[in-house]
């Protein structure tokens, strides 16, 4: 059964156990605040809430079921907190899937703000306010002046970007991925930019401007930047990248020992190595080099993605992050992943 809501950004803090859920139902955005202090009147509710929060920690490893599948702890937390919201969700008119929707509709949907309290061992929704969705405080970064040549990339309003909606959809997409530009038949991947992503976005823009120069004479297996989405206030809402149809899976999701992939690990390693070699020759560092950041398309070709920088423990040492040395260390770990 298709879920009635679509999960958007989940917010938490290292300072406390408060959280915020953002979900889309029909064409509405529900912003739901959960404060630890407001659950203290019910020890049972508070205990379960803290258990759910602890399961969102990066180092938490869920248990596999009898079929070897791992539960999605974020989905489970949403299921639990949103249970008392279901009558509210079901009271909304269904999504009109015949309508043409844009990024504007998704990113600036009408917002309904709630908090949750505990009463007699039950979670209870408390309505706070409704807004017209003209602002989205979660999405969009104001970039400072830089030496980036923006002239090579077209800018688009979110109103210009079409978001395809499945005819069976029950809600707008909380974080649209596949979008369409005016006059372009092929889809683009919309990489959303959140309010705190200033440094990451500047780094990606610099990298994609260099990749654009490489692509002219030496095609490489990375996405290209086809445009930038900017709202009426001048905030960068997202990047429009080449859409790599990978069936939704990264290299890290592939069991390379499966006979159906016989011979492919060597092909993929050669493609990854060659792409990295070309990038380094042009002064471009991949950054967060790991199997998660390699997509395998439907033609079984490997593409490097995510040029926002950083590192992932177990793939690149912190002291080698954002360096050629770090890229080569990540490449070695990818090789070990491909040839266990």
Locate predicted features.
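Phosphate/pyrophosphate-binding loops and the adjoining catalytic core of nucleotide-dependent enzymes
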Residues: 1-189, 198-199, 207-209, 223
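Conserved hydrophobic "DFG−1" position in protein kinase catalytic cores
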Residues: 181, 243, 295-296
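Eukaryote-biased feature marking scaffold/signaling PDZ-domain proteins and nuclear chromatin regulators
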Residues: 185, 203, 220, 234-236, ...
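Conserved structural core of kinase catalytic domains
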Residues: 188-202, 209-213, 219-266
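Alpha-helical interaction elements in eukaryotic regulators
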Residues: 203-204, 221, 240, 268, ...
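AlphaC helix (C-helix) of the protein kinase catalytic domain N-lobe
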Residues: 204-214, 276, 331
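C-lobe/activation-segment region of protein kinase-like
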Residues: 262-268, 281-287, 291, 295-340
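Conserved hydrophobic alpha-helix
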Residues: 272-279
């Amino acid at each position: 059964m298709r879920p009635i809501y679509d999960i958007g950004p989940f917010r938490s803090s290292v300072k406390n156990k408060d959280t915020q859920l953002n979900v889309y139902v029909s064409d509405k955005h529900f912003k739901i605040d959960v404060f630890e202090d407001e659950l203290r009147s019910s020890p049972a509710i508070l205990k379960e809430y803290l258990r759910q929060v602890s399961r969102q920690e990066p180092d938490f490893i869920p248990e596999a079921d009898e079929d070897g599948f791992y539960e999605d702890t974020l989905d489970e937390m949403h299921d639990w907190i949103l249970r008392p919201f279901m009558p509210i969700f079901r009271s909304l008119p269904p999504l009109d899937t015949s309508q043409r929707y844009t990024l504007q509709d998704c990113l600036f949907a009408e917002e309904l703000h709630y908090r949750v309290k505990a009463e007699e061992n039950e979670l209870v929704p408390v309505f706070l306010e409704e807004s017209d969705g003209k602002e989205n405080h979660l999405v969009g970064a104001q970039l400072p002046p830089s030496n980036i040549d923006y002239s090579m990339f077209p800018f688009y309003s979110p109103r210009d970007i079409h978001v395809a909606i499945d005819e069976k959809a029950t809600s707008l997409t909380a974080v649209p991925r596949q979008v369409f530009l005016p006059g372009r038949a092929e889809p683009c991947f919309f990489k959303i930019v959140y309010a705190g992503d200033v440094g990451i976005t500047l780094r990606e823009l610099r990298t994609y401007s260099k990749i654009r120069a490489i692509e002219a004479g030496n095609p490489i297996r990375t996405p290209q930047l086809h445009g930038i989405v900017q709202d009426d206030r001048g905030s960068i809402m997202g990047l429009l990248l080449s859409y790599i149809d990978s069936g939704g899976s990264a290299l890290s999701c592939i069991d390379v020992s499966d006979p159906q992939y016989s011979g492919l690990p060597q092909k993929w390693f050669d493609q990854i190595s060659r792409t990295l070699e070309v990038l380094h020759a042009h002064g471009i560092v991949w950054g967060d080099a790991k199997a998660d950041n390699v997509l395998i398309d439907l033609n079984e070709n490997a593409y490097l993605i995510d040029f926002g920088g950083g590192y992932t423990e177990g793939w690149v040492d912190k002291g080698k992050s954002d360096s050629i040395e770090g890229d080569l260390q990540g490449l070695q770990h990818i090789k070990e992943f491909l040839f266990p």
